[in-house]
């Protein structure tokens, strides 16, 4: 039998003539050919063979000669800065060290789809004088460049970058990225940097299983970015903020340890985020939600021993909502051993605090200068002051109220609800819990979901506005104003605002 594909013209099944004969391929033969193509196609279309770099060899030369998709193995040793300008994977064997220099990141990523795994990366700390001197001596290096970019260990200018099982030490910025999407940092250490990671204008950041420790400013500084996930990380001893989300939305912050910071986690004008099951301890502010941060769910976090003495003896707040942050759900959190366990302050409205346990704090919950927040189903036990309201008017019950360990009323009909209201203490307080619980709201009760809570807020938080007292005197555009009606809404951004001496400590900027 003559093989029918003896020429290109005859490589057609069933109907073509080959040497004057009609050829036919049986279905079984055709199936065998297709299976063979499937089995051997990886060999026919395999990527370029991986380059292997041993200690002392030139990584940059290997990168420059590699093809897209190559895997470059880097042996143990110490190497200078590299630039990756094509989609490659660099795999460290024996923990090779990449060293940054002044204004020269250890790694500059200029391509999408780069993976860096198994490296120790040593950065350069902030040194303004040396940076100025560098650019004065290297004028061409400064041409067309932003001179305010920090000394970064890893500079990311592409998307879909993966940093795996690596360590970054003592950089002004451990990882620095502008407008990058799809960055993943996993099972890595960012230690002793000014800022562990800075991301501006990005999307899809995923940080998991990492230790971000001993940073002098921020552990993670994420601004104007969305769809971020920070999970199963240790954020410890970062001097200013452990995690800052500013002007962004869509973040999931789950199952982290956040400890030893001034602000553990801060949401600053950041909305539609989920903060769940984190342990937050030994900070000044455990979780701070401020500056118009709205529609966030703060759920099932452990807020303990946020009470320190370096600035103000014993001060510390487990969870604080401030500065017009509204429509947030604070649910199922445990606050213990703080100065204020829970706090809602300054212009916040339509928040729900539900099914929380605040015990053994100076104040269980403190409400300051706000109204129309719904507080119910919580347990305020053995605090110096269980609940406190200052210049506020809030709603403290639905069909159930809260449990207070100092409640003295009676339950005459045995329904678990006290017959006498619990008056909320505080200057000029008019609020009361009309359905105080005789036992803590516990795990036996089925917890209400987010949609149900939002519906209750709309139904119960309907107290009318009241004219609030104006401070006796204030400085306004250089003129001392003795008295005038107070505007109902503060301006969001003010260029010439008087100093607000009543604001909470440690807030760097005052916009109101």
Predicted features, each with a name:
Residues 67, 85-86, 93, 102, ...:
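Parallel beta-helix/beta-solenoid
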Residues 43-65, 76, 406:
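Right-handed parallel beta-helix/beta-solenoid
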Residues 57, 78, 88, 94-96, ...:
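Residues at the loop-to-beta-strand transition
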